């Protein structure tokens, strides 16, 4: 209590009834009101860099009631088997997501083999979509020590571009589509970010995939 304030805490509410209860009971206990949001709003915010909008849960429920085939598809995506398939997909992704190449920038040079070994053996515990950044930080630090100065922001951005190009894709929407296609599910439309509207049944699977590939 002495270390945390209301500004440091967010309560994830399963529904509006719970949210209303919390907002009423805390002041009665002499506590400050704590920021709260629904699970769905939290998920939507976490995916806002990937899709422009997400379907509301009520709309999905309405569609399920009217379309049994759609309801069955939703149930599959809520199953343990679906989660296990996502886990399996990510395990295999390491071998085909990367496209290593020799790195050359001024006096900074690393061979394809050196970068491959660093990626798989020096930083194996770092999530896949953050691992190349760790490799880059290591290589840049080594180079800065060698030349006796820090690279400027413009130089760092050029180097980062060279490293990030070694990913075949870092777009979570694209990677989730790879998964859907590989496991025989209906894929999402291949459209630009501005037109991406994520169905509710895909929100939490995509969020789970994000947390498998990134720390947050």
Can you name each region flagged by the protein language model?
Residues 2-216:
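Alpha-helical nucleic-acid-binding subdomain
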């Amino acid at each position: 209590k002495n270390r945390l304030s209301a500004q440091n805490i967010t309560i994830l509410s399963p529904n509006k009834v719970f949210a209303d209860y919390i907002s009423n009971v805390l002041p009665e206990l002499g506590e400050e009101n704590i920021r709260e949001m629904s699970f769905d709003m939290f998920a939507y915010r976490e995916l806002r860099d990937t899709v422009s909008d997400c379907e509301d849960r009520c709309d999905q429920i309405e569609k399920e009631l009217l379309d049994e085939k759609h309801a069955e598809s939703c149930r599959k995506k809520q199953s343990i088997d679906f989660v296990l398939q996502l886990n399996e997909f990510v395990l295999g992704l390491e071998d085909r997501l990367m496209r290593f190449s020799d790195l050359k920038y001024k006096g900074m040079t690393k061979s394809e083999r050196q970068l491959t070994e660093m990626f798989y053996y020096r930083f194996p515990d770092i999530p896949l979509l953050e691992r190349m950044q760790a490799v880059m930080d290591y290589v840049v630090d080594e180079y800065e020590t060698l030349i006796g100065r820090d690279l400027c922001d413009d130089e760092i951005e050029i180097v980062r571009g060279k490293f990030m190009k070694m990913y075949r894709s870092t777009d979570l929407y694209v990677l989730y589509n790879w998964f859907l296609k590989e496991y025989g599910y209906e894929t999402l439309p291949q459209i630009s970010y501005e037109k991406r509207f994520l169905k509710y049944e895909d929100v939490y699977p995509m969020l789970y995939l994000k947390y498998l590939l990134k720390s947050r």
